[in-house]
Amino acid sequence: MSDKIRTLQGRVTSNKMDKSITVAIERQVKHPIYGKYIKRTTKIHAHDETNQCNEGDLVAIRECRPLSKTKSWTLVEVVSKA
């Protein structure tokens, strides 16, 4: 197992839960036949201890131990406000 901690940047799509946010991570994938780059989105639940995020914020998150059934990421910082 590698010692490198995974960090990602994404946009907050929901902050309706207490101390939790939903972050959309966008990546580009090359189509196997046509070669065109397509946008793909992954939604991740992350822990926001102080409830400081709002919808549309650009945030940095890092992987951590499982905090619940779906949460295993935590908020590092708010890169830019919406």
From Swiss-Prot:
Ribosomal protein listed as a keyword: yes
CDD domains with a match to the protein in the record: Ribosomal_uS17 (cd00364)
Gene3D superfamilies listed in its UniProt record: Nucleic acid-binding proteins
GO molecular function: rRNA binding; structural constituent of ribosome
Record has Isomerase as a keyword: no
Keywords in alphabetical order: Ribonucleoprotein, Ribosomal protein, RNA-binding, rRNA-binding
Any one cellular-component term (Gene Ontology): cytosolic small ribosomal subunit
One GO BP: translation
Domain of life the protein comes from: Bacteria
PANTHER family reported in the protein's UniProt record: 40S RIBOSOMAL PROTEIN S11 FAMILY MEMBER (PTHR10744), SMALL RIBOSOMAL SUBUNIT PROTEIN US17M (PTHR10744:SF1)
Function, as annotated: One of the primary rRNA binding proteins, it binds specifically to the 5'-end of 16S ribosomal RNA.
NCBIfam families: PRK05610.1, uS17_bact
Similarity annotation: Belongs to the universal ribosomal protein uS17 family.
Known partners and oligomeric status: Part of the 30S ribosomal subunit.
UniProt name for this protein: Small ribosomal subunit protein uS17
Organism whose genome encodes this protein: Shewanella baltica (strain OS155 / ATCC BAA-1091)
Organism lineage string: Bacteria, Pseudomonadati, Pseudomonadota, Gammaproteobacteria, Alteromonadales
Gene: rpsQ
